[in-house]
């Protein structure tokens, strides 16, 4: 709870253009007022609870995201921000479908269930599923160098682990996520029937982390899945001794596009209204969670910053605008 308050305070203070070494009494009093209001009167957790518990997951193109859109707009209107509006755009519609199935199939080893989630934007297998021998790669470059004949009709497993030694998790994520975003398309190009990707996470449990993958328009598409950490370890260990076969089944599919809206609210600048400071978050989330951390928190923080400044009597010279973006995830 303290972390959310500190983030709100930091965002609020950063919008007040003062130098601490030459701070006037008025500046100090304003910061003290913001601190007290953020700690004592914060509404952010109340809004976040409604967003996550009452509305829930908010994937683009779903009724839940539309509900979150109108809830956020109504909230900013009730707070009497100077301007509140919706910015229309087109968003993709992707359906996960039935619960995914994935298991190792071996006459010698038996059958082992693997924990998977279909990647966002991916196609399904249909009701019969697909089965193939697994080949393991640790980079897109390694797969690129393989002869297509070695990949054809195989299931490619991208097994490069999360870089746990990295000081910043964002850097570790960035150094690993390429195999999820671009790996399946490359595997499809080389003739694979499906792709598995080690979840992009430092967690050592077996909960797969979904995320988006991208296929170019008109490109051949294959089913692709995020694989839980423990399932990834198991598959890698078994496949190290001799190639194993895996069966996958999913019914996910793309359903075109539909209308979506960015939600925008602002405090209009008194002196330079056309110079705009933007803060924001993305309102959408994946379909298998509540989207609290990613990124409901960023949305309610942005609204709360404007509320704090307004309720404290702060009159910005430049426009301060909060934008809740509608489609970051896929």
Where are these regions (language model features)?
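Soluble metallo-hydrolase cores and metallopeptidase-like ectodomains found primarily
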Residues: 29-30, 105-107, 113-117, 121-148, ...
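N-terminal capping segment at the start of a domain
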Residues: 26-62, 207-212, 284
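A conserved hydrophobic secondary-structure block that centers on an alpha-helix together
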Residues: 139-204
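Bacterial Sec-dependent N-terminal signal peptides
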Residues: 1-26
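Short helix-loop-beta-strand segments that form the rim/entrance of peptidase-like active sites
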Residues: 46, 307-330
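Noncatalytic luminal/extracellular "stalk/propeptide" segments of secretory-pathway proteins
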Residues: 49, 53-155, 159-167
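Acidic, glycine-rich active-site loops and adjacent beta-strand->loop/helix elements
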Residues: 162-163, 201-202, 283-285, 323-330
